[in-house]
């Protein structure tokens, strides 16, 4: 009987140790990237009025409606990009999004929206392979030749976007939108929750030095910047 109890105690201790190790690993796996992105972006997130001057507003893509119009989230990002251009904080806008399907084209929708709002057409450059934040940041440097950017997205995404760009060598700061939160608090909270998993993916991309779709060097942004 004593031996059985001892065996059971040993089994429970082993199980408890395994559970604690698993919890600890989960905390490090999830918590580590979140802490990293906050540290990398600390003091680098601004409003339009107090943002430092950079060459380019890098506006990250989001959903486009079936009509071809930017979703409210994307429109809010584009409005910030235009405000930065009009305030003289940037000299050009790089719209970077998904064009991976025949009838879905974020960059063209973004560019049309900005030009219709008064942005000079020659100052709005489209990146058609910005399939995620990591790709958009890397392509801004490798394909479009700029490292001086203000990243524009929603505020819950901003720390990761700035951290990713800076980890890839860009002199990046960020300006974020939170006006769309009023449209649906649940949608906003879901976006915040998704950022936890996205932070882990960011860490994997950076550690593994993932190579997104690149291609030949583009000169359209050089022309927009007059260089």
Model segments located where?
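A general structural signal for short secondary-structure boundary/capping elements
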Residues: 100-106, 173, 196-203, 219-224
């Amino acid at each position: 009987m004593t031996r059985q109890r001892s065996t059971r105690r040993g089994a429970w201790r082993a199980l408890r140790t395994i559970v604690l190790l698993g919890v600890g690993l989960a905390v490090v796996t999830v918590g580590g990237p979140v802490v990293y992105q906050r540290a990398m972006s600390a003091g680098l997130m601004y409003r339009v009025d107090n943002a430092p001057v950079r060459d380019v507003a890098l506006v990250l893509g989001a959903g486009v409606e079936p009509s071809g119009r930017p979703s409210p989230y994307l429109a809010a990002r584009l409005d910030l990009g235009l405000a930065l251009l009009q305030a003289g904080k940037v000299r050009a806008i790089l719209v970077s999004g998904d064009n991976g399907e025949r009838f879905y084209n974020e960059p063209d929708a973004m560019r049309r929206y900005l030009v219709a709002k008064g942005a000079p057409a020659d100052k709005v450059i489209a990146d058609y392979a910005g399939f995620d934040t990591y790709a958009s940041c890397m392509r801004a440097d490798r394909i479009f030749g700029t490292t001086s950017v203000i990243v524009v997205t929603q505020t819950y995404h901003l720390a990761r976007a700035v951290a990713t760009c800076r980890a890839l060598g860009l002199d990046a700061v960020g300006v974020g939108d939170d006006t769309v939160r009023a449209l649906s608090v649940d949608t906003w909270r879901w976006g915040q929750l998704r950022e936890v998993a996205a932070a882990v993916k960011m860490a994997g991309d950076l550690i593994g030095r993932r190579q997104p779709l690149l291609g030949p060097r583009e000169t359209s942004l050089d022309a927009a910047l007059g260089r």
